[in-house]
From Swiss-Prot:
Task performed by this protein: F(1)F(0) ATP synthase produces ATP from ADP in the presence of a proton or sodium gradient. F-type ATPases consist of two structural domains, F(1) containing the extramembraneous catalytic core and F(0) containing the membrane proton channel, linked together by a central stalk and a peripheral stalk. During catalysis, ATP synthesis in the catalytic domain of F(1) is coupled via a rotary mechanism of the central stalk subunits to proton translocation. Component of the F(0) channel, it forms part of the peripheral stalk, linking F(1) to F(0).
The UniProt record lists the keyword Phosphoprotein: no
Intracellular or extracellular location(s): Plastid, Chloroplast thylakoid membrane
Subunit structure: F-type ATPases have 2 components, F(1) - the catalytic core - and F(0) - the membrane proton channel. F(1) has five subunits: alpha(3), beta(3), gamma(1), delta(1), epsilon(1). F(0) has four main subunits: a(1), b(1), b'(1) and c(10-14). The alpha and beta chains form an alternating ring which encloses part of the gamma chain. F(1) is attached to F(0) by a central stalk formed by the gamma and epsilon chains, while a peripheral stalk is formed by the delta, b and b' chains.
Note: In plastids the F-type ATPase is also known as CF(1)CF(0).
GO molecular function: proton-transporting ATP synthase activity, rotational mechanism
Family label: Belongs to the ATPase B chain family.
Protein name: ATP synthase subunit b, chloroplastic
Length: 184
């Protein structure tokens, strides 16, 4: 752009030695030069300007048509979306109503199952207590029996002498003899 401006400025400073030039000084130009320049601009610029305006008009009209088509499509999609929204709202209301009754049913089922589990745990607890009681009783019996046996063995060992030992053996032999006679 600067080169074009420089070339017009340089045209105005050429020496006037019989050559053709454009006078760029507005105050020094004559009406003929102005009318020639304006005529050339109007003649050649009219077509260019007309084409530019026609192109701009076509683009604006195309944009308006596209906008109308998009608007129509948007309105159609909006109506479909509203219909879907109404349907979803109705389904949501139905789910809400069904959900409350389902929640109550699940709540009752949960309470009943929890009650059954608590009963089972109570039964297991009672069985465990009974088992532990029986085990404790058996342990006490074993200890009492062991202590009684140890006491009896201690008493026998302390009071046992050879004479008593021989008498016991003789008595047992006698018992075996009597048993043998009975079986024969």
């Amino acid at each position: 752009m600067k080169n074009v401006t420089d070339s017009f400025v340089s045209l105005g400073h050429w020496p006037s030695a019989g050559s053709f030039g454009v006078n760029t000084d507005i105050l020094a130009t004559n009406p003929i030069n102005l009318s020639v320049v304006l005529g050339v601009l109007i003649f050649f610029g009219k077509g260019v300007l007309s084409d530019l305006l026609d192109n701009r008009k076509e683009r604006i009209l195309n944009t308006i048509r596209n906008s109308e088509e998009l608007r129509g499509g948007a309105i159609e999609r909006l109506e479909k979306a509203r219909a879907r929204l109404r349907k979803v709202e109705m389904e949501a209301d139905q789910f809400r109503v069904n959900g409350y009754s389902e929640i109550e049913r699940e709540k009752l089922n949960l309470i009943n199952s929890t009650y059954k589990i608590l009963e089972q745990l109570e039964n297991y607890k009672n069985e465990t207590i009974y088992f532990e009681q029986q085990r404790a009783i058996n342990q006490v019996r074993q200890r009492v029996f062991q202590q009684a046996l140890q006491g009896a063995l201690g008493t026998l060992n302390s009071s046992l002498n050879n004479e008593l030992h021989l008498r016991t053996i003789s008595a047992n032999i006698g018992l075996f003899g009597v048993m043998k006679e009975i079986t024969d």
